[in-house]
Structure formats: C-alpha cells, structure tokens
Amino acid sequence: MSVSRWFAHARDDGPEALRAQPSPGRPPKLSAAQKRLIPEFLWHGAEAYGFRGQVWTCTRITEVIEEEFGVRYHKGHVGRLLRELHWTPQVPIRRAIQRDEKAIRRWRREVWPELLRRAKRERRVLVFEDESGFYLLPGLVRTYAPEAQTPVIREKLTRDHLSVMGGMTLGGKVYTLVRQESLNGLHSIEFLTHLLRVAGKRLLVVWDGSPIHRRAAVKEFVTQTKGKVWLETLPGYAPDLNPWDEGGWHHLKNVEMRNLVCRDLEELHQEFHLAVDRLRQKPHLVRSCFAQAGLKIQSR
C-alpha cells in the first residue's frame, strides 16, 4: 500500500484504519461440534473400524476422520487435535481376553472378605505369593546427557536372570526366595517351608494357578502340614488381584532398581537384596499394594 493511500485511509476512516489486520487464515476443516464427536467415535475401539487390535494411532484416527467427515488431516495435526480434546498417548494395561470379569468381581466382593475373616478366626498369617524374573538387561527409565547427544549404556547381552518367589503380608512384611534356575514345584515347597519358619506357624497363602503351585508334591506337602497351610487360588488371568503384580514387583524394578546395570548374576543378587531391604523399611508402601489391587483390609 502506497503512502498516499495510507493518508487517504486515515482521512476517510480515522487512525484505526491503519492498524494491521490479522489474516483469518484457512477456515477449519471441522466445526467445533464435529470435533466433539471424535472421542465418541474412538470409544467404539479401533476394531470397530476394521483395524487389527484395539490400538489407536494418529494414522488410524486420520482414516476415521476421513471416513466419518470426508476430510483429510495430516497425522501430525491429528496429534494436536487430540491434545485439544484432552486425549493423550498412554501405555495400555494389558488384560487377557480369557478373563472372567464377573468371577474377578465376585472374588473381590465375596471371597476376599471371607479370607480375611478366616485368617482372623483361625489366627493365620495371610500371605500373597507370586513369582517374577530379574534380568541382567537393565530396565532403563531415563538419564541426562547433552542435548542432541543420545547416551549409550554398555550392557551385557544375555537372558541370564534371577527367579524370585515373593511373599507379602497384610502387616507390610516381605519374604523372598531367590534362585538362578527356573522355578518348579520343589521351590514352591521350599518357600512354603520358609514362610512357616519366619512368617507364622499357621498360614493362609493366596497365589495363582501356576503349574509349579499345582504339582502333586505340593499338595502332598500341604497335607503333611496337618492344617498349618491353607492355600487359596486366585481366579485365572487375574494378576491384578495380586498386590505383587503392579505393586511389589513394579516398585522393585522401576523404583528401587531402575537404571541398574550389573556385571553378573552375583552382583544382581546383591542389588536385589538391597532393594528388598529398602522395601521392607516401607511397610506403609507394602500395605498400599493391597489397595492398588482393589483389596480392602478394614475387615481384618
């Protein structure tokens, strides 16, 4: 615009006419009402739109928007659109399709309170048992490094690991059995014997239906205890009922032992015991694992 035209604008329309006017840009492809419909479509799940698996990606959502509204978005813009709708990328919780959700709800609502009453009535120590593996390969979380310089952690490429049995009580006590070989039924007997010696003379042990718990030798051992050990099996495909699953093991691996790189199994064994000792000093945290599993302990 020439200077003379500026003066003309100012004379005819006043000084406000000289203010810069922002460009309106392209009109949005979707209206606000259409954008609000997107979460409704996504709640139906990815498989409802013909995709394999219930995982949503920006590429898949781009196709859904095109199918529903006839407009094409770049997948990068879809990410911004989702954030605008308060949808964020998250790691999903995995659940086996074989789970019987009704049986699991019934266990929490009916069986668990009855176990608490039995433990109190029969003066048993209630112990949740579970197994897990601890590998030489580190479970890295993050570390600091100069910007744009990805750090390299040197590690020994091996599948060597420690096999661990863990016991957790309502009082916040933790017991473990660590071996460098795969666990079997004899280890189950060994751990039950250990629990009888250090946890209490009468036990109510809750564990899953693992084959190492169902061996004939285990059943025979329990019979020989003459009622000192009562075993309760969790519903199938329900590791979330065990306070070890997302509680004890998760804390040990992702808090106490995160970013840990060990040279060999002996060093890993030492670090594991140090981590367990730190966990034992936090009985309140151990007890919170029961709440995380949806198990109320007020009836104790």
Protein language model regions, located:
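Key DNA-contacting residues within the recognition helix of helix-turn-helix
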Residues: 4-7, 79
